[in-house]
Amino acid sequence: MDLISVLPSTSKSCVCLHKPLSSSTHKLKPFCRTIRILGMPRPRKSVLMASSMSMSVNTLVSDDDIQRRTGGYHSNLWNDDVIQFLSTPYGELAYRERGERLIDEVREIFSSMSLEDGEFSDLIQRLWMVDNVERLGIDRHFKNEIKSALDYVYSYWSEKGIGCGTKSIITNLNSTALGFRTLRLHGYPVSADVLKHFRNQIGQFVSCPSETEEDIRSIVNLYRASLIAFPGEKVMEEAERFSEKYLKETLQKIPDCSLSREIGDVLEHGWHTNLPRLEARNYIDVFGQDTKNMESNRKTEKLLELAKLEFNIFQSIQKTELESLLRWWNDSGSPQITFTRHRHVEYYTLASCIAFEPQHSGFRLGFAKACHIITVLDDMYDLFGTVDELKLFTAAIKRWDPSATDCLPQYMKGIYMMVYNTVNEMSAEAQKAQGRDTLNYARQAWEVYLDSYMQEAKWIATGYLPTFEEYLENGKVSSGHRVSALQPMLTMDIPFPPHILKEVDFPSNLNDLACAILRLRGDTRCYQEDRARGEETSCISCYMKDNPGATEEDALNHLNVMISGVIKGLNWELLKPDSGVPISSKKINFDITRAFHYGYKYRDGYSVSSVETKSLVMRTLLEPVPL
C-alpha cells in the first residue's frame, strides 16, 4: 500500500515527518514551551539532549486528539511597535538633493582622472575609484564611469598583469590582483595564470620582507582575487591558502587600525557571504578611518559622505516597505500560526542586503513573503502536520482553487490561502515587469517543491535511508531556493525573456548549483541538532551509508570539498565570458545564494536568529550611519 496516497487515513496517529531541509534544520534554545494550537491542547513535553547543546522538541495533543510536534523556536524578535515607530529624517527632500549634488561631484572626480592622473599611476587610480565606489555601495550611480575606467585598464592588460600606470616598467602584485578581481567580476576575459608571475622560482607565493602597509594591501587584494576562482584554477587555490595564512598572521602583529579592521572583515566574510549592503556598512567605517589613504582628501570625503547619505536615505525606504510587509503578515493570518518560526523581518533584511536599489521594492517584499511562506510550509511538513494532512495539502495546491480548502484541516485553510493569494499577487507584479503571465510557471515550481517534501515524508514513513545521490537530488529541490528566488526575481526591472530565464532558473546549471550549496551547507551546519531530534536523514548519514566505515568527520570533509567545488562552479556560471546571458540577469540569483549562505555561516541563522542574524538587522536596517 502506498503510504503517500491522496486519500486520508482514518488513523489519528501522528507520523513525525523528517525533512532535513537547510531551512528546516533547527538549532534550538534550551527550553521547552507549550504552544496553543486549535484552542485547547493537552501538552506532553519531551526534551532531546544533544552533546553540543540542549535541544527542545515540544509534543502536544490538539483538539482532534492528534499528537503533534513543534520546534520550540524563539519568538518573533521584531514586534509591530518596534518597526512601526522607527523614524528617520533622511527621506526629506533636502537629503535627496544633497545626494544628487554629491553624485555629480563624484562623476567629476571620475572625469578628472584622465586629466590629472600621471602615466605612472593612471591604472591603479582608476581601479581604486571603481573598487571603492563598489565597496561603499554607491556604484549604481556610476555604471558608465566604471565601464570607461575598466575599458581603459583592460586595454593595457597583459599576460603578466599591470603596473601602477601605463608607463610603469614592471608589473606589481597590488595593481594586478586588484585589476584581475575587478575585471573578472565585470565579465572581462582575464586568465588566472597572470598570478603565476608573482611566485618565486620554485612556484610558491612569498611575502615581501619589508611588510609595509602597501605590501600588506597587496596580499589583501590577492586574497580577495583568489576567492573569484573558477573550477580547475590551481593557482587560485594556492593564492588563497598563502594569502589567508599570511593575513591571519599579520592580524596578530599589527595594531588595531583601519587596515587591521579591513583585513578582519575580508577574512570573516570573504566573497560568498559578504552581502553588498553589509560590506558597505562595514567599509564605511574602515574607509572613514583610513588616514593614510592613497587618494586626496577631496576624493575620500566626497565618496564617504555620499556613501553615508545613500545608506541612511535607503533606510527611509525600508521603513515604508516594512510597514507594508507587516500589514501583509498580519492580514495573512501569520500571527495565528503559532507552531512556526516568524522570520519575515530577517528575510526582508537579507533581501535588502543584496538588492538595495530603490526601484527593487517588489523584489525585497516578494523575497520576504516567499521565504516566510517557505518557513511555514517547512515547519508544517517537518513537524506539525500528519502524513495524511500533508497529502491533502499537496493535492489542494495542485488544484489551485480556494474551494480546495474544504477538504483541509482548519489550521491548514489559512496557510493555503496565504500561499494562494501571495503567489497570485506576485505573479501580477511579475506580469507588470516582464509583460507576460508567469503564474503557471510559478505554480509548477511550487508543486515540484511540495512534491519533494512528500518524497521525504515517504522516506521517513517507510524508514528508508536513501543513497547520497538520491537524497541530494531531491534535497536540492526541497531546499526551497528556486521558489524563494523565482517570483521575486521576475518583479525586477531586469528583462527575463524565456531564453534568458531558462539560463537563470530551472533547469540551468546556475540554479542547480545554487540549490546544491543551500542543501549541502544547511546539512553540515544542522545535522547534529536534527539527529538529536530523532531525524536521521542528512547528507552526512547518507554519505556514511554509501561508504561503510566512514566517520562523520570523513563525511564532513567530503561535503566541504563539494561545497568548495560548487562555489567555484557558481563563480563560473555567473562570470563565464560569451555566455549570451548578461551578468546582471544572473547576478540576482547568485546573490540570493550568497544571502542564504550568510544565514548558515555560523549556525542555522533562520531558527536561531537572535545572534548574528539579529546583528545584521540592527546594523543594516535599524541603525543609521552617523554623518
UniProtKB/Swiss-Prot annotation:
Pathway assignment? Terpene metabolism; oleoresin biosynthesis; Secondary metabolite biosynthesis; terpenoid biosynthesis
Q: Its Gene Ontology molecular function terms?
A: magnesium ion binding; pinene synthase activity; terpene synthase activity
Copy out the cofactor comment.
Binds 3 Mg(2+) or Mn(2+) ions per subunit.
Tell me the residue numbers annotated for binding Mg(2+) 1.
378, 382
Q: Which reaction does it catalyse?
A: (2E)-geranyl diphosphate = (1S,5S)-beta-pinene + diphosphate; (2E)-geranyl diphosphate = (1S,5S)-alpha-pinene + diphosphate
Binding positions for Mg(2+) 3?
Answer: 530
Q: Which domain of life is it from?
A: Eukaryota
- One protein family per Pfam: Terpene_synth_C
Localization terms from the record: Plastid, Chloroplast
Task: Map motif DDXXD motif onto the chain.
Answer: 378-382
Q: Which family does it belong to?
A: Belongs to the terpene synthase family. Tpsd subfamily.
Q: What is known of its domains?
A: The Asp-Asp-Xaa-Xaa-Asp/Glu (DDXXD/E) motif is important for the catalytic activity, presumably through binding to Mg(2+).
Give the matching PANTHER family. OS04G0344100 PROTEIN-RELATED (PTHR31225), TERPENE SYNTHASE 9-RELATED (PTHR31225:SF98)
List the protein's name. (-)-beta-pinene synthase 1, chloroplastic
